[in-house]
Amino acid sequence: MPLIGKGNQAVGDLGEQTAADYLVKQGYRILERNFRSRGGEVDIVAKDRQGCIAFVEVKTRRSLAYGLPQLAVTQRKQHQISKGALAWISKNRLHECTARFDVIAVLLQDGSEPTIEHIPNAFDLAY
């Protein structure tokens, strides 16, 4: 898919779809996408083959001019994801579940297959 003329939202959406497809191929089950709560958000909530819930932040770039995508997951962003994860767990009454925070970095460049880097346990719960 050509990226020229695509806005940041469209590129981000494509990155999230690419990440979700990747997770499914790895044996994950997607439970929810783009979960929002008061002060929190999670791009993808998925369950791995061992039954662990992965709260996944997806960062997408068209080039490395501004650095690696995963470096954009700041302390503030980790806090927002943590709040979203806690809200999702509460909403779904899964207080005893095993969970972790992953980051998937997606590099989308015209004429190339997407480059995907999955970082399980990328960070701990941030209060």
UniProtKB/Swiss-Prot annotation:
Signal sequence extent: none
Record CDD domains: PoNe_Nuclease (cd20736)
Identification of the protein by name: UPF0102 protein Glov_2230
Stored HAMAP family: UPF0102 (MF_00048)
Any one GO MF annotation of this record: nucleic acid binding
Pfam family, one: UPF0102
Organism: Trichlorobacter lovleyi (strain ATCC BAA-1151 / DSM 17278 / SZ)
InterPro entries according to UniProt: Restrct_endonuc-II-like (IPR011335), tRNA_endonuc-like_dom_sf (IPR011856), UPF0102_YraN-like (IPR003509)
Cross-referenced NCBIfam families: PRK12497.1-3, PRK12497.3-3, YraN family protein
Family note: Belongs to the UPF0102 family.
